[in-house]
Design a protein with these regions (language model features):
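Flexible acidic/His/Gly-enriched loops in nucleotide-sugar-dependent glycosyltransferase catalytic domains
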Residues: 62-64, 102, 106-185
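Short beta-strand/loop segment that forms part of the nucleotide-sugar
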Residues: 32-41, 67-72, 96-97
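Short aromatic/hydrophobic "clamp" motif used to bind/position activated sugar donors
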Residues: 92
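C-terminal subregions of glycosyltransferases and related glycan-biosynthesis enzymes
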Residues: 216-317
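Short, well-formed alpha-helical segments that are part of the catalytic scaffolds
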Residues: 13-27
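Conserved nucleotide-sugar donor-binding catalytic segment
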Residues: 153-237
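Glycine-rich, basic loop-to-helix element that forms the pyrophosphate-binding segment
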Residues: 68-87, 108
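A conserved acidic beta->alpha catalytic loop
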Residues: 39-50
Length: 317
């Protein structure tokens, strides 16, 4: 029998887009799904709208495994955690209610995950759709080969983090629920930045301990990320470089291993320097792309210009 895949969707005042997403999920090429929506204390009619869609859908298809839960507002992290407690699948994937996925999204993630028994998770590329500018671009459809797969798992993950952005979010991946439940992994509640990254890193550490130390890559842009629907809190959090620094510190702690040889430690330091440069550039781009006045943008960017140039020079050596 085909494995049951749990799909967790947090909803907060996004009823219309959630219904659009759910309608597409009922037409996925992979059918053995458990779809769990979690209303995170919506202040509009989202809960009722989605509930009615589910009721009507079940009248048409009695085998449809779709439900909606409700909780007081805790953010997407809290909503996902509640969803995880209710899952009964073998694998789990997360989708944001204002995003979209292509028809073979779940099937492709599953095939990639199960292709290699040692795979901890599978990850796909995505379409980055900028709603305000009405543009879109495909990302992460290329293979990454850093040569570290057989050397050191955490160094390999660090090299992926420093190479591009496919490993940071939870939304374009499929995870093993057995690993999550055994290690009691949750999303950190109350963070306004990089909670996804912390969840992924905690998961990968637990997966490594369970002898899952490979990553399955789906080289297709199957996840459609709609940029421009974020809340003001989410948008402003990426403007603060202190948030990027905290995330970097968390990654630095995660990658440490007392058993590392001097050679592996040196290798990790090299990739950490590259990652820090990447974070500085990503922060600068987030500020540059914002709608704030130029004078305010410079206030955020000015303290970073000289350190950025200095670090870039070091890495060239």
């Amino acid at each position: 029998m085909k494995p049951l895949i749990s799909v967790i969707i947090p909803i907060y005042n996004t009823g219309d887009s959630a219904v659009k997403l759910l309608n597409k999920l009922t037409k996925q090429s992979y059918e053995n799904l458990e779809i769990i929506c979690v209303d995170d204390g919506s202040k509009d009619g989202s809960f009722n709208l989605v509930s009615e869609f589910i009721r009507q859908s079940k009248l048409k298809n009695k085998n449809l495994n779709m439900t909606i839960l409700r909780q007081k507002n805790q953010g997407a992290a809290g909503a996902r955690n509640l969803g995880l407690k209710k899952t009964s699948g073998e694998y789990v994937t997360f989708i944001d209610s204002d995003d979209e996925v292509k028809k073979t999204h779940i099937e492709d993630l599953l095939k990639s995950l199960e292709k290699e028994p040692r795979n901890a998770l599978s990850v796909c590329g995505y379409v980055y759709r900028r709603l305000r500018m009405q543009t879109e671009k495909n990302f992460f459809t290329n293979e990454i080969w850093t040569g570290l797969e057989e050397v050191n798992f955490r160094a390999y993950i660090l090299s992926l983090l420093a190479s591009d952005g496919r490993m940071y979010a939870a939304i374009n991946k499929m995870f093993r629920l057995s690993v999550i439940k055994k290690a009691k992994i949750e999303f950190p509640v109350g963070w306004d930045f990089a909670e996804d990254t912390m969840f992924v890193l905690r998961y990968l550490k637990a997966a490594e301990e369970a002898s899952f130390n490979r990553i399955g890559m789906v080289l297709k842009a199957n996840y459609i990320y709609n940029y421009g629907t974020e809340t003001s809190t989410v948008a402003s959090s990426s403007m603060k470089f202190s948030n990027w620094q905290k995330s970097f510190q968390n990654i630095t702690k995660w990658v440490e291993d007392k058993k590392d040889s001097a050679e592996i430690k040196k290798l990790k330091q090299k990739w950490l320097r590259k990652l820090y440069l990447r974070f500085k550039i990503s922060h600068a781009l987030a500020v540059a792309r914002s709608a704030m006045p130029l004078t305010k943008k410079w206030k955020y960017l000015n303290p970073l210009v000289l350190p950025l140039a200095s670090l870039a020079a070091k890495i060239r050596k």
